[in-house]
């Protein structure tokens, strides 16, 4: 079976390495152009070994078209005579003309329990919405984005402290395992999978920088989840408002909800620091309290929130607001 793999970033790497380890006939890698890869690393993707580096180490041809659906991209794919596309976080949507090139079509390794969280950022939106579990779906590729028949799934719980980066790395391993299982089944004969229930479909749109902006009207659990979801990019941020002084932009890197503690202060208000608590406490929605543990002020290094407070001298009425 001649396989063309398409992927960009750390989520794709275990699937690629698994195919190579199991002696599958990978005839080419399609990955984003180097410029686009750099942009992705600055945004939603973590830096890994690099799909291109893996391919070059194994003497596998690398193609990096800006538009895979162009006449040039289509011609290259046809010349490769693939039996199967294996796609994992590639970063480009394949046209119907491209999808019919391989004799067996294409499979996609998607980091959610489809039909929930169709789109470019399933891991981040899963965490932001306080889901308790997630997983990886292997689907048959169709012109509908993430809408093909489900060939396999694996389910896993989400740890209360997992960031999007942590979870994506873990899901990438699970995805590689079940993708290989699906390919082995396809080698033995046709498989059809189960259609998705469209009524359950939800979206996971690509993240933008402004998605990191913290809404203090949410409760502490929701804000904590939002902060984890925005790691490693775009990172959750807020403005510290002080009387008669310019606001300070702060990235909040780590925080947890204060269990059972409540406050009547308006959301965003910084509570009076306690010498016994090595954190910054902030009022959130529904009378809840968020324990802020680690921050990074604009232009400064990462630091414990308590250290930040000591250096800034808290005053009654200081608050955090949307930027």
What residue ranges belong to the model's regions?
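One-carbon transfer enzymes
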Residues: 1-232, 246, 297, 306-309, ...
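An anion-binding loop in the catalytic cleft
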Residues: 217-323
